[in-house]
């Protein structure tokens, strides 16, 4: 919806790489000019420094900045303070800021509380990860009223099917079960990391 509503051919956008593959596809569909921010190698794993992101925003002055947090497949995250610096830098030049929180609440930090204060911010979420409902193809956006009204202008007549809508409605009654599942996934990740360490192998932190 953000690409369809806000991006025209020739508009500049900033994307991280590697990241969710469909962002590159959307960029090509709508004719956007992409400035890639490639992760660099560091002692602690893949790294994308906040100052580099902010400086690129100021230099390129893109129509939109799109950053998953956590990113995939790197599993990297921006801290709460660093992410706010990026959002503010985008706001200073009038850029739309799209933060993809598809993995929430597997990663608890969220930028949703900023949506009323940061008029340029859109947060995307999905039922495909923690909720385990990837086959339903259901997600949602959170933004302030002005941005929501803009996005509604490009709202398709047929969004999701009745079966998917009803399934999500039922799923929402099982939030406690979902959170228990999240705890098991996180515990399993720690178990796997410890097992690798016992085998003499190193693993980087991933969210």
Model-derived features: positions:
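Phosphate-binding glycine-rich loop
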Residues: 1-12
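Short beta->alpha connector loops at strand-helix junctions that form conserved
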Residues: 17, 36-41, 101, 125
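Conserved coil-to-alpha-helix start sites within the AMP-binding
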Residues: 20-22
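PLP-dependent aminotransferase class I/II
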Residues: 24, 120-204
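Active-site pre-lysine segment of PLP-dependent enzymes
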Residues: 28, 47-60, 73-130
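A short helix-loop-beta submotif of the ANL/AMP-binding
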Residues: 30-34
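Short beta-strands and strand-loop turn motifs
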Residues: 35-38, 63-71, 97-99, 204-207
